[in-house]
Amino acid sequence: MSAYLHCLSHTPLVGYVDPVAEVLAEVDEVVAAARARIAAFDPQLVFLFAPDHYNGFFYDVMPSFCIGMAATAIGDFHSLAGPLDVPRETAEACAAAVLEAGVDAAVSYRMQVDHGFAQPLELLLGGLAEKPVVPVFINGVAVPLPGFQRARLLGEAIGRFARSTGKRVLFLGSGGLSHQPPVPELAKVDARMADRLLGSGRDLPTDERQARQQRVISAAEGFVADQNSLHPLNPEWDNHFLDLLEQRRFAELDGLGNAELSALAGKSTHEVKTWVTAFAALSAFGPYQAHERYYRPIPEWIAGFGSLSAHSLS
């Protein structure tokens, strides 16, 4: 019984708005090294914690957390499309264990996911269906949002379940760090966009999806030229966050409110709760050692870009 973890920022802007070649090569090297370490660990079961960007989860029913019994990636921004290899019975047992632990997570037998799930599977495992994976959605953009404490408790519950399987388990966290790309807010949009956020956005026409993606690309180009055009990145907070994870002090984030986090680091920074959930899950295996920390603010990707591995010491 052993566990490994890797948390990684994701970005849909790769190949659309990229940093200079040296930075791109640096990130590629970090990802390749992480992929090699995961391959050497050879996980038998993967738990992937990731957010959504109004591609699979909408305000018709917006859970704080959702565990997938089956899942399909839509292939936005040239990410991979197709089904994930979800072990249904394991996912069902996990969902039951989480509820019994007092954490109210929804379930989905038809989960639709975007690049937030697909990108780490492609970059770190080589594809959507290379390993059995239980996908766990954590709401990171649609208010009202879950807080750090609930994310931590979810992770602890999933970690205890994962430990009970007796398998080599990989925990993946996807998202963050500090960033605030142009994401629509229900309280601030017109009726047509509100209808999209209420569920009609599940199956966007091709031209509308392309226009939506172009808005993000244009925002990134504008952010490179003027880093006050969006909420600025916050390397100081990002590195403090990484320190807390490395030092197993992530419970200290319980007292950080959602409004305060948005003000500090941007409204999409709530995606880092996937990292907290992953580290909390790993902690269920006992003490851990974090390693291979990487961080760089990358305005071209509108992100404080981070990568961090850890393994259980049991």
From Swiss-Prot:
<keyword id="KW-0408">Iron</keyword>
<dbReference type="GO" id="GO:0008198">
    <property type="term" value="F:ferrous iron binding"/>
</dbReference>
<comment type="function">
    <text>Catalyzes the non-heme iron(II)-dependent oxidative cleavage of 2,3-dihydroxyphenylpropionic acid and 2,3-dihydroxicinnamic acid into 2-hydroxy-6-ketononadienedioate and 2-hydroxy-6-ketononatrienedioate, respectively.</text>
</comment>
<dbReference type="GO" id="GO:0047070">
    <property type="term" value="F:3-carboxyethylcatechol 2,3-dioxygenase activity"/>
</dbReference>
<dbReference type="InterPro" id="IPR004183">
    <property type="entry name" value="Xdiol_dOase_suB"/>
</dbReference>
<dbReference type="InterPro" id="IPR023789">
    <property type="entry name" value="DHPP/DHXA_dioxygenase"/>
</dbReference>
<feature type="active site" description="Proton acceptor">
    <location>
        <position position="179"/>
    </location>
</feature>
<dbReference type="Pfam" id="PF02900">
    <property type="entry name" value="LigB"/>
</dbReference>
<protein>
    <recommendedName>
        <fullName>2,3-dihydroxyphenylpropionate/2,3-dihydroxicinnamic acid 1,2-dioxygenase 1</fullName>
        <ecNumber>1.13.11.16</ecNumber>
    </recommendedName>
</protein>
<keyword id="KW-0223">Dioxygenase</keyword>
<comment type="pathway">
    <text>Aromatic compound metabolism; 3-phenylpropanoate degradation.</text>
</comment>
<keyword id="KW-0058">Aromatic hydrocarbons catabolism</keyword>
<feature type="active site" description="Proton donor">
    <location>
        <position position="115"/>
    </location>
</feature>
<dbReference type="GO" id="GO:0019380">
    <property type="term" value="P:3-phenylpropionate catabolic process"/>
</dbReference>
<keyword id="KW-0560">Oxidoreductase</keyword>
<comment type="subunit">
    <text>Homotetramer.</text>
</comment>
<comment type="similarity">
    <text>Belongs to the LigB/MhpB extradiol dioxygenase family.</text>
</comment>
